């Protein structure tokens, strides 16, 4: 199977989710990850499970997950791969990261935990703090909607299709 076929036929393995494997969240601290690892490592340690290949493989996966999630630089790379939604395994992505990251400008940023929670009654986020320049916000957040041609005086708004295209909605 070629590299392209592997990507096209890729099925994400639940064991590739190191956070779920350790029973943690991506907001967990290194101390929390280490504590969860110790509990699971005791259960699956090869010395406690004589000759069980499955327990040994699970222990190796747990060890690998702990090593990656406790190292800040490796964890940042893992989180980038995880959020990208790209159809390849983490190890394969790591081998190609310089090439792959160049084309990941389109991936969505992590917006999991906002500082200001929106309850629907008032706007949340940076725009709720006061007037802001829409040119400084991302197009996907309603900013950068600068239209009109430079120097022509044409101030007609762009068509709906053009706006969606510019905001990566189509």
Curated annotation (Swiss-Prot):
Which stretches of sequence are listed as region Disordered?
A: 101-170
Residues annotated as domain J: 17-82
Extract the InterPro entries matched here.
DnaJ_domain, J_dom_sf, JDP1-like
What are the entry keywords?
Chaperone
The record's listing under SUPFAM superfamilies reads:
Chaperone J-domain (SSF46565)
- Output the Gene Ontology cellular-component terms: cytoplasm
Keyword Glycoprotein present in the record's keywords: the answer is no
Q: What Pfam families does the record tag this protein with?
A: DnaJ
Segments of skewed composition (Basic and acidic residues): 110-120
Q: Where is the composition biased (Low complexity)?
A: 121-134
The name this protein carries in UniProt is J domain-containing protein
Query: Which organism is the protein's source?
Result: Bombyx mori (Silk moth)
Q: Which gene encodes it?
A: jdp
